[in-house]
């Protein structure tokens, strides 16, 4: 790996396990304010994670996972993501994700006053993140 001194520690923790912990050169993911890419020596900050694809770059190696919700703490030499749910492509059931996508789309189309539209939109985003992660 070229220029190891440009790496930082990425740690991703879920309620069930340490999902990932290693030195990386960049991590990209969605926040409620848009997509971000983090390199070493980034200014310290905290962010709320939004559903989408998390991309981990380690030298020439790139890994992706479906990240659904959580919080991120960014320090100059370490990024910690506290994730409610995150899945590698091999852990995703595509047919289940496609079914969830269809259900969420139907709920959004119906405009039923009893439907929590924010919840339906989040369900749709999570399903799309799962599907796109597997198909990348």
For the regions a language model picked out, list residue spans one by one.
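Short, charged, intrinsically disordered terminal tails
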Residues: 1-7
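Acidic/glycine-rich phosphate/pyrophosphate-binding loops and surrounding catalytic core
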Residues: 86-136
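Compact, glycine-rich, soluble single-domain proteins
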Residues: 11-103
